Regions:
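Interhelical loop and helix-boundary elements at the membrane-water interface
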Residues: 2-42, 75-103, 126-158
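Short Lys/Arg-rich amphipathic alpha-helical segments
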Residues: 35-47, 51-54, 61-65, 69, ...
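Hydrophobic alpha-helical transmembrane segments
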Residues: 41-45, 60-67, 93, 115, ...
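Interfacial segments of multi-pass membrane proteins
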Residues: 45-58, 103-109, 164
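Membrane interface segments of multi-pass transport proteins and intramembrane proteases
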Residues: 53-67, 85, 137-146, 172
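Juxtamembrane boundary at the C-terminal end of a transmembrane helix
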Residues: 165-173
Length: 173
């Protein structure tokens, strides 16, 4: 995925149906993915605005919402890629919303949702999302459509979440 959106074809919202406009607006992270440089980082940072929601919902309800967000994201990301005619365009950041949210789930479980841990989670997720160790790289290269767009970020979120658990249990206790 290209991190520079300056040379991508423009997204013409005014030429879309209201439904396509709504789905693409969600797909580009309510506009956060339209940043000219590093849209994935901006989308991941925007996802941190969900932290109060996860705190309010608690662990069980947050898991349900994040699973639904991920399942709906398969359609949103796939449809957005089809409408703008670019597969896994860097401006599509709904997948970052899901991956970043998955990363933060251990903080709810551990009751450690504070800004230091949230920033650690943000950094870990971005490292895995950019670095793409196996099986993230496999999902990124071999799985197509909306599932492919979502899957690499879901796996990156799981890797980052695992790192948070390891840091907490083996380094801090």
């Amino acid at each position: 995925m290209d991190t520079n959106t300056l040379h991508k074809p423009p997204i013409h919202f005014n030429q879309m149906t209201w439904f396509d406009r709504f789905i693409v607006f969600c797909g580009v992270g309510f506009g956060s993915g339209l940043a000219p440089k590093a849209p994935g980082t901006f989308g991941s940072a925007f996802a941190l605005l969900f932290v109060p929601l996860w705190l309010y919902l608690g662990l069980s309800a947050s898991i349900v919402v994040i699973v639904l967000m991920s399942l709906i994201g398969i359609y949103i990301c796939g449809h957005t890629a089809k409408v703008i005619n670019v597969h896994d365009d860097g401006r599509i950041v709904w997948d970052e919303f899901a991956g970043q949210s998955i990363t933060l789930l251990p903080l709810l479980y551990l009751q450690q949702m504070n800004w230091l841990w949230v920033i650690v989670g943000f950094i870990l997720f971005r490292i895995f999302d950019v670095w793409k160790p196996f099986p993230i790289s496999w999902a990124d290269q071999k799985v197509s459509g909306g599932l492919g767009i979502m899957l690499d970020d879901i796996i990156a979120g799981l890797w980052a979440a695992l790192c948070i658990l390891i840091f907490h249990f083996y380094l801090l206790t």
